[in-house]
Amino acid sequence: MGFPKVERLLINYKTLDEFKKFKGCGAQELSMLEELQANIIENNSESPFYGIYYGGSLIARMSLYMKRNGGEPFEITGTYLELYKLEVLPTFQKQGFGEMLVNYAKGLQFPIKTIARIHSAGFWDKLNFQPVSVPDGDFYVWHPETNLNTVTNEESA
């Protein structure tokens, strides 16, 4: 068995069955069943769902949506990712799988916005997300670091 890695989940009935494992252990606000069912019905081939398989079973998942700030009052301008419903099965929690999912999203090099759910503020703090408060509610934001050592064509001689 290879080292677990993050992969884009297929929108199909096998994934739907895998999602049912999460229903009993998480809060209703983390449920993705209805969201996945809607994508199956719409025959949407671009899956917003990502997960980690271990031993052939889905053990951790999240959804990522590409968004564009249309004037919302928060610290992101332009294109960003919205990370929703990150969840790891209880047996596999505190083993780095949630962090692995977040690091995958960070690797896409877009700012990330997420809402801390179910006592997860410490998790987001540990991963260098910054808390943001706006009238609509609180959330966390992460910005990619800019590489100060990068030389552009205009700067090179």
UniProtKB/Swiss-Prot annotation:
Span of the signal peptide: none
InterPro entries linked to this entry: Acyl_CoA_acyltransferase (IPR016181), GNAT_dom (IPR000182), YlbP (IPR017274)
Keyword terms of this UniProt record: Acyltransferase, Transferase
CDD domains: NAT_SF
Protein name: Uncharacterized N-acetyltransferase BCE_3967
Coiled-coil boundaries: none
The protein's Enzyme Commission number: 2.3.1.-
Domain N-acetyltransferase: 9-146
Organism placement in taxonomy: Bacteria, Bacillati, Bacillota, Bacilli, Bacillales
Major enzyme class: transferase
MF annotations from Gene Ontology: acyltransferase activity, transferring groups other than amino-acyl groups
